[in-house]
Amino acid sequence: MLILPKTTIKALLLVIFGSLIVSFAIFFMVLENNEITVVPNLYSLAIEDAVLELQRKELIPHIEFKFSSSALDKGKVIDQGPKPGTVLRHGNKVIIFISKGAIINRVDSFIGKNIDDVIINLKANSFDNSKLLYHIVQPLEVESELPKGIIISQNPSPGSQISSLTDLQFLISKGKDHLDKHVKNYVGIYYKDAIASLLSDSINFDIDLANIGDFGNIISQSIPPGTKINESDKILITIAKPKVDNKIVFGILTYKLRQHPSYVDISVRLKGVDGKNSLIYSFKSKGGLIKLPYEVNKGSMIELYIYDKLINQTVIN
């Protein structure tokens, strides 16, 4: 039987004991390393992807937003802290900075301008520039000595930084209407003159037709002459259908205008079969349903304009 020297036995015991110590050290290091992770590179990732990547690494995302130099960065990570490659324990916080896009403009000042002029100009500019910076929120009206429709204040305020489509709301003047409106006597008047008077006085009206004599004249009105009315009141007038030959068409142009906070210029124009243009009606309106009688040649075209912008065409057959 082989008997090892004592020195050899001691050496073997030391090797075995040392191996056990190293094994335990490696075991505990592995256990400890399971609680740490390396911060990933999040640059250029979309916000959703960056958050998921941090959650996968058992790190807590903290999101902050700021402007960047490029509009293409919007919604993506443009900076992070700590930097990629940093070793952290699970549950630590990583700040990711998300781009709000580039500052592409500052809010203009519209204070002191008429609301309808501003809206028309903004829409025209958006078509020319192929981009829309503002979404106009319904304006708020307040009592003021300023003329009706004048912008008193705006939100966002002039000079505010914007990077994308921005809600823009105005506070506008209601103005003061010092003239009371009274209904006139329209019965017995030819319909064209009655309509012109109603439009000139900015009185809302509806039209009914009757197949009786007195061709083309107003035969009744729903509100008696001399009655004081409000802006919201509407009068119904009944027209005796005019007598026309087979080349002429009598009808009612009906169209629902978009509501405006103040009066806008409306015109109804006729494009005749001979190519000549003429004006049928010109008036101011805040919008809503309009009914306008016409008497034109077959084949003519009636055009409806807000200011000088064509909004409707009707071919008469």
UniProtKB/Swiss-Prot annotation:
The organism's place on the tree of life at top rank: Bacteria
Main location, first listed in the record: membrane
Ranges in coiled-coil conformation: none
GO cellular component: membrane
Membrane topology: Single-pass membrane protein
Residue ranges crossing the lipid bilayer per the database entry: 11-31
Protein name: Uncharacterized protein BB_0063
Organism encoding this protein: Borreliella burgdorferi (strain ATCC 35210 / DSM 4680 / CIP 102532 / B31)
